């Protein structure tokens, strides 16, 4: 019994020599916030890395309708732009209209004499970009022919009619003289003249309308000349007609002259359209037009333009995000996410940023957790938090600025290529999209890498700042924590947080405690010997008690032990 008491006293004395068992020390850990479920983003080095927060950069849906503000959107309804320009009777309501964006519907149809335009897309684009159907009639003199020809295929009201912007010339009496007409451009703007040639379905129709068996139309300026000969022959019937009209156009520059020479089959201009330069355009869409505001329009409907990229449609009008192939690209706007471990040892010790993040810290990105004589606590470090936020704020705007600047340069260059080599138009467009899709992914990956690196750097800066403050008064425990070798109450912890900690005040106390602790650590062999001796004696006493019990039981006859030799 005396031996046991002595061992207990010795063990108590050994542990009582450890200064850390009292209120003379504190533990301070640095960490960053975390969330239970982060967002995966892509960086240069990782395809998937979890961050606390991220912003989607790709607009993937439209609002389902076309907004009529801030752009003037003109609904073509049942008319195509070309029919409205030519003056198809059912499109008369569009005469002299203006637009920023002309919407062509899939339900649009022609309701006049059947025609074709050899380069339909180019004429459509020229008129669309002009943004107006403003027309000026001119006094062409057509001598010896009959003007204002009409057709039952093109009725205006109950009467046979024709395109209102064209003048169909046929024979007068039994003659069709050669026509030579000139029209100078004395204005300071370009004039667009629309004219055509009629292709009869039979030779009989040719001579019946124009006398000559084969007509000819030549339209010239100082810069160009077009000579067209009619192709006589039957074609599929359209609105009761097997003949056709081919539509052409000529642009006359200021100071130039329009010359028309024909001996038959001429569909003459009545005047000109004033050419204008601007940002007007045309779009095929069946989306409804509504009263709302959106600066970006696609055939699917208007879309918000607060993101740098979109995956809704390649065709856009206005200030729109750039089209890319990816459905999603996420820009990291938070730090690397390391969810907090729910179980950390049997004593629930606090841990620093090396081990994991802290989900409970909601008032800042970086902060402190401490354990001292007054208990435990947590506080955010607003300065380092603000430093990180300031660097991340504006990333989205910078991405938009970079994409806009680069895109306009590429778009201008590609437009020149498309204008010269029409066969490369689709190839160039696809290449442009591929290029931007790659650039977008690379740009976002670079920005995400930068965000994660800078937020990690702010954590390290805070750790180094704290270490420099504490100096020899504390020891780095690893894992982002410090063991402070002096009594550090909440006010002391607060001074460390706000940078006013004076290590000289606590230096002597810290050194004294550190030496005591280190002294015990240096004599750890002595403590270990006592523990081993205590363990051995305890085992010996247990064996003695067990042996005494067996002998007592044998004497009482409760246990019989037979030994056979």
Swiss-Prot record:
Q: Which UniProt keywords apply?
A: Clathrin- and caveolin-independent endocytosis of virus by host, Clathrin-mediated endocytosis of virus by host, Disulfide bond, Fusion of virus membrane with host endosomal membrane, Fusion of virus membrane with host membrane, Glycoprotein, Hemagglutinin, Host cell membrane, Host membrane, Host-virus interaction, Lipoprotein, Membrane, Palmitate, Signal, Transmembrane, Transmembrane helix, Viral attachment to host cell, Viral envelope protein, Viral penetration into host cytoplasm, Virion, Virus endocytosis by host, Virus entry into host cell
Which pairs of positions does the record mark as disulfide bonds? 29-481, 67-292, 79-91, 112-154, 296-320, 488-492
> Which residues have a glycan attached per UniProt?
23, 37, 53, 78, 180, 300, 498
Q: Which Pfam families match?
A: Hemagglutinin
Q: Which domain of life is it from?
A: Viruses
Task: Give ranges for the Cytoplasmic compartment.
Answer: 551-565
Q: Which residues lie on this side of the membrane: Extracellular?
A: 17-529
Give a GO cellular-component term.
host cell plasma membrane
Membrane topology term? Single-pass type I membrane protein
Query: Any coiled-coil ranges, and where?
Result: none
Q: Which GO terms label this protein's molecular function in UniProt? A: host cell surface receptor binding
Sequence intervals crossing the membrane = 530-550
**Signal peptide (UniProt feature, chain positions):** 1-16
Q: Extract the InterPro entries matched here.
A: Capsid_hemagglutn (IPR008980), Hemagglutn_HA1_a/b_dom_sf (IPR013828), Hemagglutn_influenz_A (IPR000149), Hemagglutn_influenz_A/B (IPR001364)
Cite a single GO BP annotation: viral budding from plasma membrane
Marked site, Cleavage, at 344-345
Processing after translation: Palmitoylated. In natural infection, inactive HA is matured into HA1 and HA2 outside the cell by one or more trypsin-like, arginine-specific endoprotease secreted by the bronchial epithelial cells. One identified protease that may be involved in this process is secreted in lungs by club cells.
- Primary role: Binds to sialic acid-containing receptors on the cell surface, bringing about the attachment of the virus particle to the cell. This attachment induces virion internalization of about two third of the virus particles through clathrin-dependent endocytosis and about one third through a clathrin- and caveolin-independent pathway. Plays a major role in the determination of host range restriction and virulence. Class I viral fusion protein.
Entry's family note: Belongs to the influenza viruses hemagglutinin family.
Q: How does it assemble?
A: Homotrimer of disulfide-linked HA1-HA2.
Anything else the record notes?
Answer: Major glycoprotein, comprises over 80% of the envelope proteins present in virus particle. The extent of infection into host organism is determined by HA. Influenza viruses bud from the apical surface of polarized epithelial cells (e.g. bronchial epithelial cells) into lumen of lungs and are therefore usually pneumotropic. The reason is that HA is cleaved by tryptase clara which is restricted to lungs. However, HAs of H5 and H7 pantropic avian viruses subtypes can be cleaved by furin and subtilisin-type enzymes, allowing the virus to grow in other organs than lungs.
UniProt protein name: Hemagglutinin
């Amino acid at each position: 019994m005396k031996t046991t008491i002595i061992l207990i006293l010795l063990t108590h004395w050994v542990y009582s020599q450890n200064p850390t068992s009292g209120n003379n020390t504190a533990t301070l850990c640095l960490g960053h916030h975390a969330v239970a479920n982060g967002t995966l983003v892509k960086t240069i080095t990782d395809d998937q890395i979890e961050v606390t927060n991220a912003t989607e950069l790709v607009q993937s849906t439209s609002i389902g309708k076309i907004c009529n503000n801030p752009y003037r959107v003109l609904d073509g309804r049942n008319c195509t732009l070309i029919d409205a320009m030519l003056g198809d009777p059912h499109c008369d309501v569009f005469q002299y209209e203006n637009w920023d964006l002309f919407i062509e519907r899939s339900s649009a149809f022609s309701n006049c004499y059947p025609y074709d335009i050899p380069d339909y897309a180019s004429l459509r684009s020229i008129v669309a970009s002009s943004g107006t159907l403003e027309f000026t009639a001119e006094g062409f003199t057509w001598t010896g022919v009959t003007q204002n020809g009409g057709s039952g295929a093109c009725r205006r009201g109950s009467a046979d009619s024709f395109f209102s912007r064209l003048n169909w010339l046929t024979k007068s009496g039994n003659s069709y003289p050669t026509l030579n007409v000139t029209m100078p451009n004395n204005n300071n703007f370009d004039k667009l003249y629309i004219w055509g040639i009629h292709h009869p379905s039979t030779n009989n129709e040719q001579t019946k309308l124009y006398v000559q068996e084969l007509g000819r139309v030549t339209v010239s300026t100082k810069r160009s000349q077009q000579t067209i000969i009619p192709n006589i022959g039957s074609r599929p019937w359209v609105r009761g007609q097997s003949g056709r009209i081919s539509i052409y156009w000529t642009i006359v520059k200021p100071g130039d002259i329009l010359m028309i020479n024909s001996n038959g089959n001429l569909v003459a201009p009545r005047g000109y359209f004033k050419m204008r330069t601007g940002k007007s355009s045309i779009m095929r869409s069946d989306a409804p037009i509504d009263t709302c505001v959106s600066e970006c329009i696609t055939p699917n409907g208007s879309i918000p333009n607060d993101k740098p990229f979109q995956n809704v449609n390649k065709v856009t009008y206005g200030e729109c995000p750039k089209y890319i192939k990816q459905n999603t690209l996420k820009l990291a706007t938070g730090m690397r996410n390391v969810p907090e471990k729910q179980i950390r040892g049997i004593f629930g010790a606090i841990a620093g940023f090396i081990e994991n993040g802290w989900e409970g810290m909601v008032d800042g990105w970086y902060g402190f957790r401490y354990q001292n004589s007054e208990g435990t606590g947590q506080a955010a470090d607003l300065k380092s938090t603000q430093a990180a936020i300031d660097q991340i704020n504006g990333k989205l705007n910078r991405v938009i600025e970079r994409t806009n600047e680069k895109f306009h340069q590429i778009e201008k260059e590609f437009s020149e290529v498309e204008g010269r080599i029409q066969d490369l138009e689709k190839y160039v467009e696809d290449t442009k999209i591929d290029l931007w899709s790659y650039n977008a992914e690379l740009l976002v990956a670079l920005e995400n890498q930068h965000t994660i690196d800078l937020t990690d750097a702010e954590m390290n800066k805070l750790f180094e700042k704290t270490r420099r403050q504490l100096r020899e008064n504390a020891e780095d425990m690893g894992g982002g924590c410090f063991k402070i070798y002096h009594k550090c109450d909440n006010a002391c912890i607060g001074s460390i947080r706000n940078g006013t900690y004076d290590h000289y005040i606590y230096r002597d106390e810290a050194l004294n405690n550190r030496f005591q602790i280190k002294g015990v650590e240096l004599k750890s062999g002595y403590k270990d010997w006592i523990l081993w001796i205590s363990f051995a004696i305890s085992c010996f006493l247990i064996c003695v008690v067990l042996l005494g019990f067996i002998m007592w039981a044998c004497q009482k006859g409760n246990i019989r032990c037979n030994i056979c030799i």
